[in-house]
Design a protein with these regions (language model features):
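Multi-pass membrane glycosyltransferase architecture that uses lipid-linked
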Residues: 1-244, 248-250, 280-417
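Juxtamembrane membrane-water interface segments that cap and precede transmembrane helices
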Residues: 96-105, 257-276
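Alpha/beta-hydrolase-fold enzymes
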Residues: 252-255
Length: 417
């Protein structure tokens, strides 16, 4: 992409970001709430336009690694074993989808984004379904035009989109008492990538405790079926495959505290190595502690949607490893809950993504790298701000961050012991 074209696209994305912010927090524009058909048409049009502009500029993980997983499936090979280490560390749900996408005969940079695009349209519907009824149409519109989903889904083509859609659908099913369906959807979400396990506490929060065993039993079915399919369809050596499956790591040294440590010369950058492994372990411990604290402190005070958003924000605050697509995780949930603090995160995270995809990624530089690291500190501060601290006050009413609709109460108001 030439400099002039990049500047034009940057201007367009800034305009979209301004529109999203305008329709969320500014005066009469906050009332903009088109019908679902109009919102979906705009969402589809924007995503197709970004896909077209991004053609030949798709990041290498989707352009190369994800394509390789589909090719491996078509050759009856296990992507866990034939791809280089850290390029694929998940169950074969998406490689099966990638194989189907390759079979369409479309150029991969189009075909590989079909599933994420369709999933993101489902998310556009679900954010309205999970929001308060009077806010449903407005929240759908805000998600449809927000630049962060546009970039992660249509520019990057990341599989966060189906994971988010399935996780939201699991919350929707649990809220409506469809326990078995909620468990199956949760299991499918975890089958796409590992991180949607963060939806599990929220699903349980919306489910009466006597039905928790049903959630667990149905949630394990999709992963077990996928594991059973691997030796049959992919000729997997299950011992080796399971070791690779359990070795996933995020890219360390580019975000938050590990990014600052790398700039100071104390940490390397990447997925593994002598200057990375200790910090990966520290990051894992920090994540587990942070998630545990969120559940212990906020369980009786939040709905399933709010609890899930808090868990994702806490993860982003303390994680050692990071990918730009992680920023998408809490976006739909924060739009559902609403509030100005949520929009501080939604705005800064969008700015980070615009800079990463449209400035840093096409032409990496030391200066841009430093901007991203220090910019991550601002996004982390926004994530901390977006946590529902006001709920810690005795007898606090839902206000500020929370404006989401609460379903009829369940029997889960006490701490899960």
């Amino acid at each position: 992409m030439g400099a002039a074209a990049l500047l034009i696209f940057l201007a367009v994305m800034v305009g979209i970001a301004a529109l999203a912010l305008l329709t969320s927090v500014v005066g009469p524009a906050r009332l903009l709430a088109p019908p679902l058909s109009v919102t979906l048409a705009v969402a589809l049009g924007l995503r197709l336009a970004v896909m077209a502009i991004a053609f030949h500029h798709t990041p290498y993980d989707v352009a190369l690694w994800f394509r390789s997983t589909g090719e491996a499936v078509l050759q009856h090979q296990d992507p866990l074993l034939v791809l280089p280490r850290y390029e694929w560390n998940f169950l074969p749900a998406m490689p099966y989808v990638h194989a189907l996408e390759l079979s369409t005969g479309l150029p991969w940079e189009i075909a590989g984004k079909l599933c994420p695009l369709l999933a993101d349209l489902v998310t556009t519907v679900l954010v309205g379904t999970l929001a308060a009824p009077e806010r449903a149409a407005r929240v759908r519109w805000q998600y449809a035009v927000h630049p962060l989903p546009l970039l992660v889904v249509a520019w990057h083509g990341q599989i966060e989109a189906p994971a988010v859609a399935l996780g939201l659908a699991a919350l929707w099913a649990a809220r409506r008492g469809r326990t078995g369906v909620g468990g199956l959807l949760l299991g499918l979400a975890v089958s796409v990538k590992t991180w949607p396990v963060l939806f599990a506490p929220g699903v349980l929060r919306e489910t009466p405790r006597r039905r928790w065993p049903l959630v667990a039993a149905t949630a394990v079915l999709p992963p077990l079926l996928l594991l059973a399919s691997m030796p049959l369809l992919l000729g997997s050596d299950m011992g080796r495959s399971l070791r690779v499956l359990g070795s996933y790591r995020g890219n360390t040294g580019i975000w938050g505290w590990t990014g600052i440590q790398r700039l100071a010369g104390n940490v390397g950058q990447g997925f593994g190595g002598p200057r990375i492994d200790p910090y990966q372990r520290m990051g894992l411990i920090a994540v587990l502690v942070a998630l545990g604290l969120v559940v212990l402190v906020f369980w009786p005070r939040l709905t399933g949607v709010e609890l899930t958003a808090a868990l994702m924000l806490a993860f982003l605050v303390v994680t050692a490893g990071f990918g730009s697509q992680y920023l998408l995780w809490p976006v739909a949930l924060l739009m559902i809950t609403g509030g100005w603090r949520a929009w501080v995160y939604l705005t800064l995270a969008a700015g980070y993504a615009v800079f990463f995809y449209l400035v840093y990624f096409p032409a990496p530089s030391i200066a841009a790298d430093r901007v991203l690291v220090w910019g991550s500190v601002l996004v982390i501060a926004a994530a901390l701000l977006a946590l529902p601290w006001e709920r810690l006050r005795p007898e606090s009413r839902p206000a500020g961050l929370r404006s989401s609709w609460r379903a009829p109460p369940t029997a889960n108001d006490e701490l899960p012991i």
